[in-house]
């Protein structure tokens, strides 16, 4: 019984303890579950917050990438627009160039039509001349027939006389007639021999010229009257013109060159018939563009500097040509004069290159004939030296060249060659004849010369010479293709009233002495400067 009670007591105690343990575990499990729930809720909040932050970051990243993409698209669009604009400008330039070429072709075609018209006129004159010649020949034949009939009558009369003559008298008449016939035959044979000798001489001369021309490889580029200067950008045009045009007027008055500024992009055109003045203007303008300081004082400084530089270049041209032709021991003054011919043209042909070509041809001809080759080359090289100064000294270029060759003690053969190459005096040597032939070859070959260009340049040169012929004139420049003559006078010699009178006199002399199209503007400039230095 006691055992049962103890068992029950222990069982109850165990139940109580088990309940207590289970209750404690359940409580702990509940707390753990609540803590887990709280942690889960916190994690959910954190996850939501992180998701919102990630979403915001993704949104900002997308916006940034979108802006970058838009910017890249904008840059690409601008680049495409720039390329398209460049292509359009290139096509525009090409079309404009084609239009210029087309205009040049039309001008050339018009000139060709004019030439054809002149040829037709000359052919018509030739036909008229031939018709007149045929008429003259017909009349001459009629006259000859009349003479033959008269001779027949005369012979018949003579035969009648002979019939009544003695044997000795008849023999004398026959011998006299025979002598006349023989004299006629001898004269015909002499003429035939002379013609054969002339034909043979002409053939030999042509063979010599052909061999000399085949051995000479010359080239030539026609001279022009304009020079193009390229600009870094179009804004430079305004700086070249200057305020109220002071810069461009100063440059034109100092160089005597017409400066043309038009709508052509990044280009300025220098126009003038004097190549030396045009080259000085080009050098000055390029130096001004490179330097950046463009004002009248700087322009005057650079023009003077480039004049000195041009003197050095002229001497270098002369030395190079003398070396090319093989003419040693030339006087320095003669070398400088020959260098000036680089900037002189004759009917569009560069005179220095023409002189070198004549020297080479004369040397080749001399070698074929066994003459002094070096002397022939030297004489041919110097034959046109008078053209270097014929604008400044009175007389033809032949007279001036002869005088300078004599002054610098050139060989008498060279002096005679210069004097005789245009037939003014008699040639005294074979070399003089060879140089004259070489000069004719170099001048007359197709494409060497352009007569219309030479006539244009001569008209401008005559215009300047008329202006400088008056007392007190310092310089004169023909501008605007001869439509304006600008005259610089010495202020100490001429007053303001004298300037007006001078312009009137120049106008009258131009009207009396020159033939020209349109009008010519005469501008006389009198500039007085007073310079002092503060110390």
Swiss-Prot record:
<dbReference type="InterPro" id="IPR004088">
    <property type="entry name" value="KH_dom_type_1"/>
</dbReference>
<dbReference type="InterPro" id="IPR036612">
    <property type="entry name" value="KH_dom_type_1_sf"/>
</dbReference>
<feature type="domain" description="HD">
    <location>
        <begin position="351"/>
        <end position="444"/>
    </location>
</feature>
<comment type="similarity">
    <text>Belongs to the RNase Y family.</text>
</comment>
<protein>
    <recommendedName>
        <fullName>Ribonuclease Y</fullName>
        <ecNumber>3.1.-.-</ecNumber>
    </recommendedName>
</protein>
<keyword id="KW-0540">Nuclease</keyword>
<keyword id="KW-0812">Transmembrane</keyword>
<keyword id="KW-0472">Membrane</keyword>
<dbReference type="GO" id="GO:0004521">
    <property type="term" value="F:RNA endonuclease activity"/>
</dbReference>
<dbReference type="InterPro" id="IPR003607">
    <property type="entry name" value="HD/PDEase_dom"/>
</dbReference>
<dbReference type="GO" id="GO:0003723">
    <property type="term" value="F:RNA binding"/>
</dbReference>
<dbReference type="Pfam" id="PF00013">
    <property type="entry name" value="KH_1"/>
</dbReference>
<comment type="function">
    <text>Endoribonuclease that initiates mRNA decay.</text>
</comment>
<dbReference type="Pfam" id="PF01966">
    <property type="entry name" value="HD"/>
</dbReference>
<keyword id="KW-0378">Hydrolase</keyword>
<dbReference type="InterPro" id="IPR006674">
    <property type="entry name" value="HD_domain"/>
</dbReference>
<dbReference type="InterPro" id="IPR017705">
    <property type="entry name" value="Ribonuclease_Y"/>
</dbReference>
<keyword id="KW-1003">Cell membrane</keyword>
<feature type="domain" description="KH">
    <location>
        <begin position="225"/>
        <end position="285"/>
    </location>
</feature>
<keyword id="KW-1133">Transmembrane helix</keyword>
<dbReference type="GO" id="GO:0005886">
    <property type="term" value="C:plasma membrane"/>
</dbReference>
<feature type="region of interest" description="Disordered">
    <location>
        <begin position="110"/>
        <end position="141"/>
    </location>
</feature>
<keyword id="KW-0255">Endonuclease</keyword>
<dbReference type="Pfam" id="PF12072">
    <property type="entry name" value="RNase_Y_N"/>
</dbReference>
<keyword id="KW-0694">RNA-binding</keyword>
<feature type="transmembrane region" description="Helical">
    <location>
        <begin position="4"/>
        <end position="24"/>
    </location>
</feature>
<dbReference type="InterPro" id="IPR004087">
    <property type="entry name" value="KH_dom"/>
</dbReference>
<dbReference type="InterPro" id="IPR022711">
    <property type="entry name" value="RNase_Y_N"/>
</dbReference>
<dbReference type="GO" id="GO:0006402">
    <property type="term" value="P:mRNA catabolic process"/>
</dbReference>
<dbReference type="InterPro" id="IPR006675">
    <property type="entry name" value="HDIG_dom"/>
</dbReference>
